[in-house]
Structure formats: structure tokens, C-alpha cells
């Protein structure tokens, strides 16, 4: 069963996410039906038709070739529900309301093919609670498949099973998403906001809290927390504006409502500045104003003290810029010891995230690799948070974090778990090793997935501390120049294709 061939997909819900997922499946040459409610006037599939037209105007472009929009088949639940039987995978992407989703599941269930997989693209609702909208037979073929926005460009897809999901369904979906759709798949537990948003949004909340504590401006913080840290250029507040401040507030509220026993609960209060912006309809980029506002050609930044927009230009101090260029261990030590408020702020946000992932690893993920890859692929960090901790010196950093917790400087009093300080992780100097990545539940280093689809990937996204194949030397080199290397994969049966790797800056071809 594990080689189910997904030949046709239905996407239910022609909103922003549903339509873009459909577009990306078309990019991958997978036939797609895009369903929505029957329109009250005009053509019955008018809602889906309009969504397909809107896709052509979206930026960044959801299609590789704009004219491919014609290949999405618009559909509505009145006329086309029988066509669901033709689909091997159904992805539900309607609004985040449990009752609406359950109503839809009841309506479409009789029309789902016996072999088909049904997956929800929810970002915050419990997959287990959602599964209660299905018969036992369909529950076994149901899971969460969480794409990140915009789905053509974001590498991450989280796969979330329930206690009743058949394991082979997950293998089939992971294989399809990896090989056909070109995604990086991380399997998550059914906990609020799964892995990437749980840790990534905590990181944003920590930045907001520490920026306020140290009296830093939003544009100053963005200069400190973007490319200088090897993270997305849009850094923190610009990212929030792009995502939409209402969406941000919704994700934070999910944590507040569903994590009553979390030791970091006080932080899951929507920050006053964010709540104020949402209340005034300043939702970020889509409404023209958020933390930033474009006035003509000038981008202004919110001054939270006055509530007005002022000229931007806040930057990292020269001293802090110099510290950030130092090697990882020295960098953290200097930030921690400096009196400069920007340096203190940076040490604090590193500490807060290390504290959080240490406390929560066991409850949110199977192992440390899943957290690092989720944050790299879902939030655009060059290195995951556990990698950052490990490369800076695992034991020393752990001591510093615990010292700050004991001194009341951290965002929670929760101590770091025992596995951080003693046993295999302390002995190996971190969570990522040649054997695999640390799983607190099984108390072992868990190796990478052995799914057959990964045999094709000689260089899987490497993590600090692992020992994988080195792309610079792997295989049998045929010839090499300053700008490129031609080589063969010398594994049996793989040695019939010459591979050329570019070594030049931006992969340019020299004359």
C-alpha cells in the first residue's frame, strides 16, 4: 500500500491557502479540483473561478507559468461532489472553525474514494478533535498536512497524525510531498500550533517582550534579528506585517486557549501593541499599516509610546555588529557580558528560545532534528535553535541559561530538564550526533527517516553535529576547475549520470 500513486487531488476551500496549494500542485503537474461553496449568482463554481483569477495577480507568483491557472478545475459542492471519488488525496483548507470543518466532513465523506487520504491544512486546531467528524474507517486515512504561506516558496510541510492514523498513510504522503511537490516534511505531534509556529511564534513573543524591556525600537530590532543572525531578511516585525497581524494574534490566542499548564503561559497574552494595532484595523501589509507604514516612497515605523509613525533607520550599534561577526561561543559570551542594551537584548532572546526548546522538546516533537528543520524551513533561519545552542558550546550555554532562570531573568521559572545536563547529550556535547538526534522520550539519538524516497537524496539538509556526505568531495570526481566539479555518484546502479556542481559565487558560469 505504501506506494499509493497520487494521480489527482481535490482541494476543499478556495481561500488564500487553498487556492495557492492548488496552484503549487499544478506547478508539480498534479491535476487538481478546487472546490468551494456554490455561488449565489452567476456560474455555480464562481467562487473557485474568482479565486483562480486572483491567483494570477498574487505576488509572489503562485504559478511558475501564469497560464497554467487554466489547468485548475473549478468545482462546487452541489454539482461536482461526485468527482471527489476520482481523487487519491483530498486536502481541506477552509476557515479555522471546528464546526464548519465537521459540517463539511459530513457532507463529503460519502464521496471519498475507498483508498483516498483525507488531510486538513489547519494551522491550529487539534487534528484529533477534527478526526471526530469522520467514521472510524475514514479516521484511519485522516491526518494533518500543514503547508506554510506562500506554499510555493516555503519549504516546510508538517505532517500530523492522530492516534488512529494508519502509519502507511503518512509514508505515502511524505513520499508524495517530498518527491512530487518538492517539500521538506517534518512529522509533528498533535499539540497546539504543531512545531514551527509553536517555537517560531514563541521566538517572536520573546523578541517583543525583551525589546520592550530594553527599550528598543521596532526597526532597530529588525536590523538586529534578521540577516545578522542568519535569519529571514524581514526579521521580526516586518515578518509579522507580511503574515498579517490578525493571523499572528490568532496563532497567539491558540496558544493561550490551549496551553493552560504551559510554564510560559503569561507570555501567550497578545502583546498590547499588537492588540492595539489589530483593534484599529492596522493588520500589516494587507491593510497598508502595521508595525511599519509606507507613506509615498518612505517607510515609517510605529513609535509605540506615541502611537504615531516616525522616520525609520534604527540600526545595530557598531559594537554589536562586530560582536555578531565573532565565532558562536565567543559571540554569546560577549553579548551576555556586555552592558550595551542591544547586546543584552540579543543574549536574552537566544536564552529565551534555548530555554523554551529545552523545556518543550519532549512534548512537541519526536526529536531535536524536527524542531531545527521546522524552524529552518518554516521561518527561514539558516540554523535551527538547537544547532545554535550546540555550536556555541552545549554545556556552557546550558549553565548560563540555568543561571539566568535561577536569577529570575528568564521568561519562566521552569528549570531545564535533567537530560540537558547529564547523560548522553552532555557526554556528546549536544543533541545532534553521527547516530542521530536526541529524543527525550526514548532517551536515544534517533536516526533520520529510512523512507525509500530519501535514498535519492545524497545530501539531506545537514545539521551541525551530524556527519553526512560532504557535497564538495562526495563520489568519484571526473574533473574539477575553480568554478565547477564534474562527478559520478559511485554507488552501484547510480553511476550512469554525470553530475556538475558549481562552486562559484551565486553559481555563475565562468567563460
Segments predicted by a language model, with ranges:
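N-terminal glycine-rich phosphate-binding loop for ADP-containing cofactors
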Residues: 2-511
Amino acid at each position: 500500500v505504501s506506494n499509493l500513486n497520487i494521480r489527482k487531488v481535490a482541494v476543499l476551500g478556495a481561500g488564500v491557502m487553498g487556492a495557492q496549494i492548488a496552484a503549487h500542485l499544478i506547478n508539480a503537474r498534479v491535476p487538481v479540483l478546487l472546490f468551494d461553496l456554490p455561488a449565489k449568482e452567476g456560474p455555480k463554481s464562481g467562487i473557485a473561478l474568482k479565486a483562480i483569477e486572483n491567483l494570477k495577480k498574487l505576488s509572489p507568483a503562485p504559478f511558475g507559468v501564469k497560464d497554467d491557472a487554466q489547468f485548475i478545475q473549478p468545482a462546487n459542492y452541489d454539482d461536482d461532489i461526485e468527482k471527489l471519488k476520482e481523487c487519491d488525496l483530498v486536502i481541506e483548507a477552509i476557515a479555522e472553525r471546528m464546526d464548519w470543518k465537521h459540517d463539511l466532513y459530513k457532507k463529503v465523506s460519502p464521496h471519498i474514494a475507498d483508498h483516498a487520504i483525507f488531510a486538513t491544512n489547519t494551522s491550529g486546531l487539534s487534528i484529533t478533535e477534527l478526526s471526530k467528524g469522520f467514521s472510524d474507517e475514514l479516521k484511519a486515512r485522516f491526518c494533518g498536512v500543514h503547508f506554510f504561506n506562500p506554499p510555493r516558496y516555503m519549504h516546510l510541510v508538517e505532517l500530523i497524525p492522530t492516534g488512529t492514523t494508519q502509519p502507511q498513510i503518512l509514508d505515502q504522503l511524505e513520499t508524495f510531498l517530498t518527491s512530487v511537490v518538492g517539500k521538506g516534511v517534518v512529522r509533528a505531534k498533535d499539540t497546539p500550533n504543531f512545531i514551527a509556529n509553536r517555537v517560531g511564534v514563541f521566538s517572536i513573543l520573546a523578541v517583543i517582550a525583551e525589546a520592550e524591556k530594553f527599550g528598543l525600537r521596532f526597526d532597530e530590532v529588525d536590523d538586529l534579528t534578521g540577516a545578522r543572525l542568519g535569519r529571514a531578511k524581514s526579521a521580526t516585525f516586518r515578518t509579522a506585517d507580511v503574515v498579517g497581524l490578525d493571523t499572528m494574534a490568532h496563532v497567539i490566542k491558540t496558544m493561550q486557549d490551549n496551553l493552560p499548564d504551559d510554564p510560559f503561559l503569561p507570555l501567550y497574552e497578545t502583546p498590547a501593541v499588537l492588540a492595539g494595532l489589530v483593534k484599529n484595523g492596522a493588520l500589516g501589509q494587507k491593510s497598508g499599516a502595521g508595525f511599519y507604514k509606507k507613506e509615498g516612497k518612505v517607510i515609517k515605523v510605529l513609535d509605540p509610546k506615541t502611537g504615531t509613525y516616525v522616520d525609520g533607520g534604527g540600526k545595530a550599534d557598531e559594537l554589536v555588529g562586530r560582536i555578531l561577526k565573532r565565532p558562536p561561543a565567543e559571540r554569546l559570551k560577549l553579548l551576555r557580558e556586555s552592558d550595551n542594551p542591544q547586546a543584552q537584548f540579543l543574549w536574552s532572546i537566544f536564552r529565551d528560545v534555548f530555554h523554551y526548546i529545552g523545556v518543550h522538546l519532549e512534548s512537541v516533537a519526536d526529536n531535536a532534528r524536527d524542531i531545527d528543520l521546522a524552524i529552518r524551513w518554516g521561518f527561514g533561519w539558516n540554523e535551527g535553535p538547537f544547532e545554535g545552542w550546540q555550536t556555541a558550546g552545549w554545556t556552557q550555554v546550558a549553565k548560563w541559561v540555568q543561571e539566568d532562570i535561577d536569577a529570575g531573568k528568564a521568561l519562566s521559572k521552569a528549570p531545564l530538564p535533567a537530560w540537558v545536563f547529564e547523560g548522553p547529550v552532555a557526554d556528546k556535547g549536544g543533541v545532534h550526533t553521527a547516530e542521530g538526534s536526541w529524543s527525550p522520550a526514548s532517551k536515544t539519538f534517533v536516526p533520520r527517516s529510512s523512507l525509500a524516497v530519501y535514498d535519492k537524496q545524497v545530501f539531506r539538509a545537514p545539521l551541525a553535529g551530524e556527519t553526512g556526505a560532504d557535497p564538495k568531495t562526495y563520489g568519484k570526481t571526473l574533473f574539477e576547475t575553480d568554478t565547477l566539479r564534474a562527478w559520478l555518484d559511485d554507488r552501484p546502479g547510480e553511476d550512469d549520470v554525470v553530475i556538475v556542481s558549481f562552486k562559484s559565487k551565486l553559481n555563475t558560469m565562468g567563460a
